[in-house]
Swiss-Prot record:
Transcriptional regulator (lacking a basic DNA binding domain) which negatively regulates the basic helix-loop-helix (bHLH) transcription factors by forming heterodimers and inhibiting their DNA binding and transcriptional activity. Implicated in regulating a variety of cellular processes, including cellular growth, senescence, differentiation, apoptosis, angiogenesis, and neoplastic transformation. Its main location: nucleus. It comes from the Eukaryota. The keyword Nuclease does not apply. Residues 52-104 form the bHLH domain. One of its GO terms (biological process) is positive regulation of neuroblast proliferation. Disulfide bonds: none annotated. This is DNA-binding protein inhibitor ID-4. Keywords: Nucleus, Repressor, Transcription, Transcription regulation. It comes from Homo sapiens (Human). Residues 117-161 are annotated as: Disordered. GO terms for cellular component: cytoplasm; nucleoplasm; nucleus.
Amino acid sequence: MKAVSPVRPSGRKAPSGCGGGELALRCLAEHGHSLGGSAAAAAAAAAARCKAAEAAADEPALCLQCDMNDCYSRLRRLVPTIPPNKKVSKVEILQHVIDYILDLQLALETHPALLRQPPPPAPPHHPAGTCPAAPPRTPLTALNTDPAGAVNKQGDSILCR
């Protein structure tokens, strides 16, 4: 996952610190569809953090820390195995994320629709410089046949890219 943060050339200072309050708001507005109803609160919080970082002398480091803390809080909201009302460290958040990804991978590997398909044949050897044709993919509609199992809340989309 890549963080959704503005990238600026190193050695150049942002016009108004931490990417600027306007830039943080624009960045959040671009991804507002995935923030659900808390878009205004998240935008205000990000702008406040960026304005606080603006006053500090070590601006680039604080901007990076601001971006990283935003991504950790997004991960905390997105991963369902993290207890919502318990303080967890960044390492614990990453451990929960890794476990959640492994659980999702296992669920994909053991999905009944995928088990019914015969294994793909071994790809033939192609000479260097040529690309083999991609194997056909299983349509998502075939995998998502259980509507009761697919619960999609408005705030459940990935924010960091």
